[in-house]
């Protein structure tokens, strides 16, 4: 007797009697409940442990009204859309990594949790996808609204004492711009002045006068001078740059050996527990050492003791800036750029007392001058070097003169090297991969941070501010939810016990 299968039933068929027995396997009732009319509460449809519910409980969103009150008219015009809802819509987009505002609105239409979070009923019409864009252009453009939202959420994290700013980790990542790499033009652009330009010029002239040289006159930088720490010291220098015709504010960035794209550089600072403390947005073709000051100005007053950064920030200017402000810079070893087969700069020993260098053949390189980039030049005697057995490993100059440069702020770099070799600093630097680099990975993997659909630096700053705000708030909401019915003090003690080192744990338990 054969078995016959249907979509929902298993049949046993008797060929002799032409009968069959039915064995129910599954129930088909998909179409029976579509036309039902039910009464329910929106709040009951959202699980108690849903992320949006936790976020809504973690912060009072009414602070947005105070931030936008001056953007709305009080005595004329028709009623506007609720500003809190207006901000929550892109917040949902960046929280869940939805690719566009149009897709976000489609998701809100069918997602009960999204509607509950926005305060919409099941039959309420969802705002048009262009509503936020129009409000941004007419109300929020050229304002710091989104940075204030980020700061307000960060204050909540400080209120719960979850942030430890003693060790701050700084790094930058690139976000691909919405620009075709084939649609570009070349233009002549002025090099931006460095943040230390005036101070460097003053100290260069003081150094020259101390060596019996005349102060430098105001003129364009000599192209033969070596580059200063992070770039040219003359803000008027011109250079040819590639500019996107789609997004002129983005920068041409070398993503790999064979791939170039237009992108934005996002510099970020976080503490050792992964809380984002600040950010800055710049074109992708600007070096991290040049744009560091824009981020540093935002975080320098939060109580930093040690600032950890990669080799891109290891310049004399940044080392001096941090040490003068009482901050310990933890910067890694930087491989020398010396050509293969030649002596490295470290093999030339500097004599601080006589202010000279001694080469591997025990010959003196005496002080010659201080150039416009802030480097002292030490030169050897060509007649002595002509018969040196190490000449081919030292220089290829026609006059057999070896030139070694030393920045006037080199003592600050030497101090950084001493800090790097201090016991325990190697372990602190290794935390970069667990803090700031992990943040970039999370943002790109879960929050749509690999590329941007926004055009322009201002819109990109809005995206970065809301993305980092939602990452901090997501983390805060989950930690508050773990507290449950326990008191605030016990929860904070548990959090500190989990996050801090074993030695600190004993102190906390003794309290």
Where are these regions (language model features)?
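Short arginine-rich
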Residues: 115-119
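Hydrophobic alpha-helical membrane-insertion signals
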Residues: 14-53
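Anion-binding and metal-coordination hotspots
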Residues: 8, 90, 97-110, 120-511
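Basic, short loop/linker segments at the boundary and entry of helix-turn-helix/winged-helix-like folds
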Residues: 48-91, 96-97, 408
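A short, ordered amphipathic alpha-helix with a cationic face
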Residues: 28-32, 78-80, 122
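A ubiquitous short alpha-helical element
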Residues: 24, 73-77, 424-427
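Short, positively charged and aromatic/hydrophobic N-terminal segments
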Residues: 3, 10-13, 18-21, 496-499
């Amino acid at each position: 007797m054969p078995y016959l299968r249907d979509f929902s039933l298993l049949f046993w068929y008797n060929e002799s009697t032409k009968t069959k027995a039915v064995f129910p396997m599954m129930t088909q009732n998909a179409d029976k409940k579509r036309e039902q009319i039910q009464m329910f509460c929106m709040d009951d449809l959202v699980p108690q442990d849903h992320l949006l519910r936790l976020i809504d409980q973690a912060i009072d969103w009414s602070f947005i009204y105070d931030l936008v009150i001056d953007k709305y008219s009080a005595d004329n015009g028709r009623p506007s859309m609720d500003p809190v809802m207006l901000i929550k819509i892109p917040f949902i987009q960046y929280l869940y990594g939805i690719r566009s505002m149009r897709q976000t609105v489609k998701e809100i239409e069918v997602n009960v949790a999204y509607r509950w979070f926005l305060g919409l009923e099941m039959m309420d019409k969802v705002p048009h996808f262009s509503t936020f864009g129009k409000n941004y252009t007419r109300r929020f453009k050229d304002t710091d609204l989104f940075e204030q939202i980020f700061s307000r959420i960060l204050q909540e994290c400080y209120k719960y004492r979850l942030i430890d700013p003693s060790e701050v980790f700084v790094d930058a990542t690139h976000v691909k711009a919405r620009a075709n790499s084939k649609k570009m033009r070349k233009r002549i652009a002025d090099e931006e002045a460095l943040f230390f330009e005036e101070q460097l010029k003053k100290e260069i002239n003081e150094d020259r006068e101390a060596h019996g040289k005349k102060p430098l006159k105001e003129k364009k930088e000599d192209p033969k001078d070596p580059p200063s720490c992070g770039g040219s010291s003359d803000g008027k220098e011109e250079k040819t740059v590639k500019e996107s015709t789609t997004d002129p504010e983005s920068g041409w960035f070398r993503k790999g050996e064979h791939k170039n794209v237009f992108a934005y550089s996002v510099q970020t600072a976080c503490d050792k527990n992964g809380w984002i403390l600040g950010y800055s947005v710049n074109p992708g073709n600007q070096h991290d050492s040049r744009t560091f000051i824009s981020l540093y100005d935002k975080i320098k007053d939060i109580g930093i003791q040690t600032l950890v950064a990669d080799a891109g920030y290891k310049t004399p200017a940044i080392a001096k800036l941090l040490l003068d402000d009482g901050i310990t810079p933890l910067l890694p070893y930087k491989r020398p750029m010396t050509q293969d087969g030649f002596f490295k700069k470290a093999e030339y020993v500097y004599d601080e007392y006589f202010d000279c260098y001694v080469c591997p053949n025990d010959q003196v390189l005496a002080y010659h001058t201080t150039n416009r980039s802030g480097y002292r030049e030490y030169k050897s005697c060509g007649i002595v070097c002509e018969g040196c057995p190490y000449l081919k490993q030292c220089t290829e100059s026609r006059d057999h003169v070896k030139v070694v440069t030393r920045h006037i702020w080199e003592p600050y770099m030497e101090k950084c090297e001493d800090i790097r070799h201090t016991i325990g600093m190697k372990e602190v630097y290794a935390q970069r991969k667990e803090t700031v680099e992990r943040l970039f990975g999370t943002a790109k993997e879960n929050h749509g941070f690999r590329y941007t659909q926004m055009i322009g630096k201002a819109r990109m700053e809005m995206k970065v501010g809301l993305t980092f705000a939602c990452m901090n708030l997501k983390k805060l909401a989950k930690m508050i939810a773990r507290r449950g019915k326990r008191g605030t003090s016990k929860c904070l003690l548990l959090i500190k016990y989990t996050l801090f080192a074993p030695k600190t744990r004993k102190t906390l338990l003794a309290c």
